[in-house]
């Protein structure tokens, strides 16, 4: 039905006037055919793809007169370039090539000097705004969703559809630090719907697309322990449990009723607001307790990654495109 008649929420046109019912059925069958073997993309593969710019030399200060903290990036998806604009005059300071099909959510280092750009085919590019030069790039996945930077600017998380992993990169060296297989508590291998930074919590938050779970991955060396199952303790400091994770990149599982496709947070990052795959409702998950605290109708296909919350007449409200 979607191929034949389109989906208004995505501005996708229908193809019923170009494809016969038999052709549409064949196309659906092809799309739904699972891969015979899921391709791997390991730490070694990522490291081998790493390509640092040989002509890059860091500068002690910006090489242009504009305010380096008032820069606008224009992501040109049609021809795979990014334009760097002076935020005051909108003069073009540089225009540089990017990998194919760049995602429109570049991430800046805390000092605003470096920007990291991800393409849908898994390439991550590091660009130095001060020198207006590319630092380097590597391929963190084969089909990637988005990226997030840690609160301290040390780590970059890459959410992947293929393979089903979360890749952690060093923002300093552009080297892979860890590749986490995204496997739900019930053993389901899952794609990552999206990953975002939760700065107050010193963690990455990601939603699993194929399993009803939210993950919190710590960027704090003192995080945890996080337990996957029940914890049994008869006395103080005598915990009996299996599968606990703690420290840097420790994972905490938060079960939800159904998989979430997109989400965002309230201003203090205590609550996550997510939407289900069918686009019929939203849920509010408290990240401290891990429980659902509210449910609200969200028909259509809201893009919660661009949502916002604020206080209005003493009530906390939200808006999302």
What positions do the PLM features span?
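Extracytoplasmic electron-transfer domains, predominantly the class I c-type cytochrome c fold
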Residues: 1-35
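Repeated scaffold domains used in trafficking and secretory/extracellular systems
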Residues: 52-62, 102-107, 143-151, 188-196, ...
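Residue-level detector of Asp-centered blade-edge/turn motifs that repeat once per structural unit
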Residues: 66-68, 110-111, 151-152, 199-200, ...
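Hydrophobic beta-strand positions that form the internal "hydrophobic ladder"
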Residues: 72, 115, 156, 204, ...
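Short loop/turn segments that connect beta-strands within beta-propeller blades
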Residues: 87-89, 128-132, 170-174, 219-221, ...
